[in-house]
């Protein structure tokens, strides 16, 4: 029993650390803000080089610094508005109103820029859900195994071997990909195969990227992949080592061979290109990507900044403008923890490992 939880607690008065307790104490003692505390878990769970870089930027205060800059600008505008509340005989001059509006509009642009990193942040943290789809027996499972570098899915010459989705994660071109091998898409009366195709459709609906696989050595067949998908699609012309059928000669796609590895570099480049506008851009050694909680608060902050601008433009009473600015400040404070609630802290730190 020496060293056991019961022995330590009962004989020495120690208590077992709660999830995230060390990080929570660092936050409560002012050693880090809430964005940095969140980044601790992001660093631990990073699934790719870019995800780690974004987490490290946040841990170093990259997100918090931008929020603090926005807060300072808001306080500056609010101070001017409060002065007119304290001295009601003075009206806001056109020049002052113009300066304040310019500052608020600049803030709206910065908020919009931060909000645009939210989708990229999700892709970095969760990985790009990549569905491998196509007709039966075109080499979807072989593609999965080739990209993984080991045999994960059963491969055979019998069409319809894959009946259920198989999911694995890899890192490619600095990004985390969650590869999902799916059942072949075709019309079938087989109940089990129909269930597999239903799961395939579900995977396609939630995918961030679809790799449409075709057997380039055979004549082109009807495409059963759902046409209404919004996710980017990349056509993989597989089995090119067996020769390319005339039907595929003029079709744009990535020539690939699971047997020789041909086309892997082109696939990596195509994936980077497909998400070039979604992923956050690097600035020097920094990579800022907000999370869903930040996105929610920044969105609300932006709305209140917009309402404050409208209030000034309409020459409303400064009390209304001040109210919107205070609300905007509150939402910024929620991000860094300057304004916090136990519910928010509990939700964040409960996802940590014990201690940490």
Where are the regions a protein language model picked out?
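Short, small-residue-biased leader/transition segments that mark boundaries at the very start
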Residues: 1-8
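Short, Asp-centered acidic motifs that coordinate Mg2+ and/or phosphate
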Residues: 177, 209, 234
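Generic enzyme active-site microenvironment
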Residues: 179, 213, 236
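Noncatalytic alpha-helical scaffolds and linker/capping helices
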Residues: 175-178, 183-187, 192-195
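C-terminal-of-GTPase-core extension/linker across diverse P-loop GTPases
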Residues: 52-171, 188-190, 217-356
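Inter-motif core of Ras-like GTPase G domains
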Residues: 193-216
């Amino acid at each position: 029993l020496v060293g056991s939880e019961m022995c330590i607690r009962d004989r020495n008065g120690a208590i077992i650390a709660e999830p995230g307790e060390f990080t929570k104490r660092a936050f409560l003692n002012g050693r880090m803000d809430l964005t940095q505390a969140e980044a601790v878990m992001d660093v631990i769970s990073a699934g790719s080089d870019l995800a780690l870089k974004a987490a490290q930027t946040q841990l170093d205060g990259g997100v918090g610094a931008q929020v603090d800059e926005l807060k300072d600008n808001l306080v500056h505008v609010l101070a001017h508005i409060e002065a007119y509340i304290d001295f009601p005989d003075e009206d806001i001059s056109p020049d002052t109103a113009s300066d304040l509006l310019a500052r608020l509009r600049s803030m709206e642009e910065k908020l919009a820029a931060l909000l645009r990193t939210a989708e990229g942040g999700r892709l970095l943290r969760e990985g790009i859900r990549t569905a491998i789809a196509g007709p039966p027996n075109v080499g979807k499972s072989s593609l999965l195994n080739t990209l993984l570098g080991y045999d994960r899915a059963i491969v055979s010459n019998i069409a319809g071997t894959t009946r259920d989705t198989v999911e694995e994660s890899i890192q490619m071109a600095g990004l985390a990909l969650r590869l999902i091998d799916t059942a072949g898409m075709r019309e079938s009366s087989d109940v089990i195969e129909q269930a597999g195709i239903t799961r395939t459709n579900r995977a396609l609906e939630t995918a961030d990227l679809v790799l449409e696989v075709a057997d380039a050595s055979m004549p082109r067949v009807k495409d059963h992949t759902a046409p209404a998908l919004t996710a980017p699609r990349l056509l993989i012309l597989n089995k090119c080592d067996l020769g390319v059928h005339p039907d595929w000669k003029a079709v744009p796609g990535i020539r690939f061979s699971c047997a020789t590895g041909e086309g892997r570099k082109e696939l990596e480049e195509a994936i980077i290109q497909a998400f070039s506008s979604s992923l956050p851009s690097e600035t020097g050694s920094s990579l800022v990507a907000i999370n869903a909680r930040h996105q929610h608060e920044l969105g609300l902050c932006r709305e209140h900044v917009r309402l404050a601008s409208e209030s000034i433009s309409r020459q409303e009473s400064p009390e209304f403008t001040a109210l919107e600015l205070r609300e905007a400040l509150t939402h910024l404070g929620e991000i860094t923890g300057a304004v916090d609630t136990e519910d928010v802290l509990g939700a964040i730190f409960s996802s940590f490992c014990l201690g940490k």
